[in-house]
Amino acid sequence: MAAAFDREKALEHAIAQIERAHGKGSLMRLGDEARAPIDVIPTGSIALDVALGIGGLPRGRIVEIYGPESSGKTTLALHAVANAQRAGGIAAFIDAEHALDPEYAKKLGVDTDNLLVSQPDTGEQALEIADTLIRSGAIDVVVIDSVAALVPRAEIEGEMGDSHVGLQARLMSQALRKITGALSHSGTTAIFINQLREKVGVFFGSPETTTGGKALKFYASIRLDVRRIDTIKEGQEAIGNRTRVKVVKNKCASPFRQAEFDILYNVGISREGSLIDMGVEHGIIRKSGAWYTYEGDQLGQGKENARNFLRENPDLADEIEKKIKEKLGIGPRVDAPIDLTVVER
């Protein structure tokens, strides 16, 4: 009994010593306080928010969005930026590809006047800028577009054709080790957009892999695989893409869920299209033949007409969205203000 008392006393003394050296809360018992709910930034697609299991992209974590070219990766990231800004947050976009279109970003709802943008010359510069912004505690979301464009300084300064094996992977590994802890303390969401490459000589399994080595796969709490699966047409004219996102990795909820939604050209993710799809799936909107109805009121014949009707009647769209979210138990409206001040800065 005395030995147990002495051990407890020694432990309390050790905890007090650790807190004096490293600050209060640096060591605690897991059961001392109730775990706070995960704060999120909505993605812009209610279907994807549901697939993520927590209602959006988690704050204070690393998110990787990858897929083939023109699949909607940057569009998805910009919608997250727009939602963070709409809630009063500050966003940064590190444009390593030097390809950000401000006009397109504005159409998606991004406040381009207040968006912090950097077009770095090297991978080291890009990641140092990201690290400084994250450690400031003032940024809600930072997007790095893309990992493939984070070219190490040695490669840029070297000759064309020089071998630089593993330089980018080492750079990413070092940077992620540094920023992971800072993200947790600042509550910043770091979104890394990544490209696909093919592994040579793979006969079994998928030959596809992402750039930048394996570090990002380990450090990311969420990994989203974005694919374009169909073209949306109005008559003979293509007006958008049908997109499928698979949650390949999820440390916050169950992984391997999928979401499908429409991305319309010069519009972005179709909120109304997602509401129609989810409403029909969960019995809130009735589909009879080509007609869509809600509580006896006709929304339109065909999905495009129903989409236009909801766009012209935002109050009705809000009502449908509220019912879907209440039924599924997920967070606030995708384009409504959300509280981004939960994490102390």
Swiss-Prot record:
Residue numbers binding ATP: G67, P68, E69, S70, S71, G72, K73, T74
Keyword Cytoplasm: yes
GO molecular function, one term: damaged DNA binding
Gene: recA
GO biological process terms on file: DNA recombination; DNA repair; SOS response
Gene Ontology terms: cellular component: cytosol
One family name in Pfam for this protein: RecA_C
UniProt function note: Can catalyze the hydrolysis of ATP in the presence of single-stranded DNA, the ATP-dependent uptake of single-stranded DNA by duplex DNA, and the ATP-dependent hybridization of homologous single-stranded DNAs. It interacts with LexA causing its activation and leading to its autocatalytic cleavage.
Top-level taxonomic group: Bacteria
InterPro entries: AAA+_ATPase, DNA_recomb/repair_RecA, DNA_recomb/repair_RecA_CS, P-loop_NTPase, RecA-like_C, RecA-like_N, RecA_ATP-bd, RecA_C_sf
Protein name, as recorded: Protein RecA
